């Protein structure tokens, strides 16, 4: 008497637990999902003015200015130009660079339920 074959595994293999499932176990799906979204989580988690301005300073000044305006429309001008102004990457007059660099950059971002970043001003800095 033969054994019942189900997608390449016999019934006896299923009863002993030696058959290989074509699907990943749940914990592997969760791990892969977390790894896929890790860069986004790190970027949102590190939504500190100085750190994001440093990351944006890697790009050419015209790209970083447009990039920060598109992503963070409520971001104060001093945050998007803080580090690039000090490095001289912006092609603006020296007095304008100095004005950008001297502006204080206070406050934090928070993630709303819609997933948008909003600038939260410190109470003493309004």
From Swiss-Prot:
Iron-sulfur found in the keyword field: no
One GO term (biological process): symbiont-mediated perturbation of host apoptosis
Keyword Transmembrane helix: yes
Subcellular localization(s) per the UniProt record: Host membrane; Host mitochondrion
Membrane topology: Single-pass membrane protein
Assigned keywords, A-Z: Host membrane, Host mitochondrion, Host-virus interaction, Membrane, Modulation of host cell apoptosis by virus, Transmembrane, Transmembrane helix
Major subcellular site: host cell
Bilayer-spanning residue ranges: 24-44
GO cellular component: host cell membrane; host cell mitochondrion; membrane
Complex and partners: Interacts with host CAMLG; this interaction allows efficient apoptosis inhibition. Additionally, interacts with vGPCR/ORF74 and induces its proteasomeal degradation.
Function: Plays a role in the inhibition of host apoptosis to allow completion of the viral lytic replication and may thus favor the maintenance of persistent infection in infected host.
The protein, known as: Protein K7
Organism of provenance: Human herpesvirus 8 type P (isolate GK18)
Gene that this polypeptide is encoded by: K7
């Amino acid at each position: 008497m033969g054994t019942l074959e189900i997608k390449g595994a016999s019934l006896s293999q299923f009863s002993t637990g030696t058959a290989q499932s074509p699907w990943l176990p749940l914990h592997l799906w969760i791990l892969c999902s977390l790894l896929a979204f890790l860069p986004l989580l790190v970027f949102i988690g590190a939504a500190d003015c100085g750190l994001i301005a440093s990351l944006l300073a890697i790009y050419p000044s015209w790209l970083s200015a447009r990039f920060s305006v598109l992503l963070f429309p409520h971001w104060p001008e001093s945050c998007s130009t803080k580090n690039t102004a000090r490095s001289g990457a912006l092609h603006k007059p020296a007095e304008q660079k100095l004005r950008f660099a001297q502006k204080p950059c206070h406050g934090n971002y928070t993630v709303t339920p819609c997933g948008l970043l909003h600038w939260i001003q410190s109470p003493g800095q309004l």
